[in-house]
């Protein structure tokens, strides 16, 4: 057995390394940037090493567990561990954060604080995905909100304070339900709190109480995912945030809500999930069509991409609600797939804004000729977003739909209706994606602003784009890489529903 605290190292390294940034000279933006990238790279390499040499793919149990008594008063442990459900989001977090740090090169105002906040956010996200104590999970969940709020409120558009305030009101408000659910579950059986994930998995509750807990957790995770009607903070936030922050929001933060739904609502509250799963299916179907239709009406480029993210999150609900092996594996694949695609689209939207200083699609046009590289990469990743065969988005959405069709829980007529409604959403997706490409890159040059700089993608931007494009295509061609570490865990979760 390996006793080295790998997961504690991965969680602590970014924030400890980030704290040293404030010791750097005041005028050293390049040094600070490359130092931050090195911290992210080292953390990602450690995570990759642990995955390659210390993680057993065919073991559905929690691995690399670390338990350190933190507070004796109520049996609170610093407890970490990973399994097939958390490994993918952890690797995704390291990868996207490293690229987002590289994408943040144009940020020069208060750069020390900016990069420290990115690293603090990194620690909070890794801590959330690897926590094996439900109170530690809550602490990491809340800790991560602080750097996000500061990144939103200090760097971005003119309405950044409004969007940051809206974000914190939604997320902090929903955290009240999360805390109440945690306290209720922990203190149900005795005066001694039960905080360990393994103990909570084996805990049973009266059905009525389990439903109450389920609703509380669902509200908390619905805000982060986001699920309609608790999604309205997302377009405003993406519309105002700096694009490196948007990469972290779309690539990682939204996945925390989906992870919570599977980890807590499905694994701990299986009876309540069986009751609510048809409603999740209905909500997911409505969300796919509603968000796709709303995206088509958005003039703001970043808001259009934000609504497309909301639409794609609807497939997660379908997979989670299907209660089938295929559907849940598809939902986990969608978490990873959309993490890459969403982050890439916001990065490319940001690079376009850096050149044009425009965000409204009806003010753009004819960008394909002066910027052919940006045009090519933007087109390919938009095709990935609309689920072109050979891309990760296609495989994820197809497997989710197969999960619905093969589910034993629903009648044939229900499956046909769900598939029909989802197909409408899949038709709307290319409409708003191709419309966006047409308005940006084709036609006559509509913009004529003195602050525009017509130069194509540089080496840094090409590197980031290609780095994200490679896994999108790789997963689309060989999705079994993701299933190799999620399949056994999915079987273990679904065994609670037999």
Curated annotation (Swiss-Prot):
It is a multi-pass membrane protein. Pfam families: Proton_antipo_M. GO terms for cellular component: chloroplast thylakoid membrane. Keywords: Chloroplast, Membrane, NAD, NADP, Plastid, Plastoquinone, Quinone, Thylakoid, Translocase, Transmembrane, Transmembrane helix. One of its GO terms (biological process) is electron transport coupled proton transport. Its main location: plastid. The chain crosses the membrane at residues 4-24, 31-51, 76-96, 113-130, 134-154, 167-187, 208-228, 242-262, 272-292, 305-325, 330-350, 386-406, 411-431, 463-483. One of its GO terms (molecular function) is ubiquinone binding. It catalyses: a plastoquinone + NADH + (n+1) H(+)(in) = a plastoquinol + NAD(+) + n H(+)(out); a plastoquinone + NADPH + (n+1) H(+)(in) = a plastoquinol + NADP(+) + n H(+)(out). NCBIfam families: NDH_I_M (TIGR01972). HAMAP family: NDH1_NuoM. PANTHER family: NAD(P)H-QUINONE OXIDOREDUCTASE CHAIN 4, CHLOROPLASTIC, NADH-UBIQUINONE OXIDOREDUCTASE CHAIN 4. Belongs to the complex I subunit 4 family. This is NAD(P)H-quinone oxidoreductase chain 4, chloroplastic. It comes from Glycine max.
